[in-house]
């Protein structure tokens, strides 16, 4: 079963509907005891990095996330949820993140290296390029994904950048180290590629449960 962590800032409806379409058993909850019933977790997120970290601390969910990661359970961050996995963000002043992955979250530039203007936020479809082999990619086509974000991850470990998209800079699109995974785009809104990625995450969670 997949536990969707509800800390008050997630795109819960669209994530839930995507999990239903993927045939997954899931719960959406802010209650730690309820979430403990799950085998793997999704950390969604839309909004401010600082507000999200404050809510995770206030609800006790920050400690719960550290606990399940230490137990080896899969954690998959989506959009802001992915950014929260990193060390810090410059959004609204410097804010510490969960620190599960090395890297910092910074504002996208409004121009590319040739001076061509770019719209911020980065909103719409963009092509994915896979860099590192990962079990998360089994059966996942290297296609287009749907992005909505103004900040991106920089200074991360190159081997933990599993896929990227080009938006004036190389934007880490899928990241991962061990049981900690994330996508900057919205898999639940990303058609064939997004659904394939979610289904593979569910498959990995099922395999992990069976092999306990």
Swiss-Prot record:
One of its GO terms (biological process) is L-histidine biosynthetic process. The active site is at residues 79, 186, 188. InterPro entries: Class_I_gatase-like, GATASE, Imidazole-glycPsynth_HisH. Its EC number is 4.3.2.10, 3.5.1.2. Keywords: Amino-acid biosynthesis, Cytoplasm, Glutamine amidotransferase, Histidine biosynthesis, Hydrolase, Lyase. One of its GO terms (cellular component) is cytoplasm. Residues 1-211 form the Glutamine amidotransferase type-1 domain. The keyword tRNA-binding does not apply. Its main location: cytoplasm. Pathway: Amino-acid biosynthesis; L-histidine biosynthesis; L-histidine from 5-phospho-alpha-D-ribose 1-diphosphate: step 5/9. PROSITE patterns: GATASE_TYPE_1. It catalyses: 5-[(5-phospho-1-deoxy-D-ribulos-1-ylimino)methylamino]-1-(5-phospho-beta-D-ribosyl)imidazole-4-carboxamide + L-glutamine = D-erythro-1-(imidazol-4-yl)glycerol 3-phosphate + 5-amino-1-(5-phospho-beta-D-ribosyl)imidazole-4-carboxamide + L-glutamate + H(+); L-glutamine + H2O = L-glutamate + NH4(+). It comes from the Bacteria. It is found in: Cytoplasm. GO terms for molecular function: glutaminase activity; imidazoleglycerol-phosphate synthase activity; lyase activity. IGPS catalyzes the conversion of PRFAR and glutamine to IGP, AICAR and glutamate. The HisH subunit catalyzes the hydrolysis of glutamine to glutamate and ammonia as part of the synthesis of IGP and AICAR. The resulting ammonia molecule is channeled to the active site of HisF. Heterodimer of HisH and HisF. PANTHER family: IMIDAZOLE GLYCEROL PHOSPHATE SYNTHASE SUBUNIT HISH (PTHR42701:SF1). This is Imidazole glycerol phosphate synthase subunit HisH.
């Amino acid at each position: 079963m997949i536990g969707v962590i509800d800390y008050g800032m997630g795109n819960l409806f669209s994530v839930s509907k995507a999990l239903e379409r993927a045939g997954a058993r899931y719960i959406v909850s802010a209650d730690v005891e309820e979430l403990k019933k799950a085998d793997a977790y999704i950390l969604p997120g839309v909004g401010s990095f600082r507000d999200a970290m404050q809510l995770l601390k206030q609800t006790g969910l920050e400690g719960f996330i550290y606990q399940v990661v230490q137990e080896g359970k899969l954690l998959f961050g989506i959009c802001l949820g992915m950014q929260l996995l990193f060390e810090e963000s410059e959004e609204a002043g410097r804010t510490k993140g969960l620190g599960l992955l090395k890297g910092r979250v910074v504002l996208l530039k409004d121009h590319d290296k040739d001076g061509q203007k770019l719209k911020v936020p980065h909103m719409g479809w963009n092509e994915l390029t896979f860099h590192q082999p990962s079990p998360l990619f089994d059966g996942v086509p290297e296609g287009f994904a749907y992005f909505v974000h103004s900040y991106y991850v920089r200074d991360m470990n190159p081997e933990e950048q599993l896929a990227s998209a080009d938006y004036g800079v190389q934007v880490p699109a899928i990241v991962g180290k061990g049981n900690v995974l994330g996508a900057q785009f919205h898999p639940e809104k990303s058609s064939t590629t997004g659904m394939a990625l979610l289904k593979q995450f569910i498959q990995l969670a099922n395999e992990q449960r069976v092999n306990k």
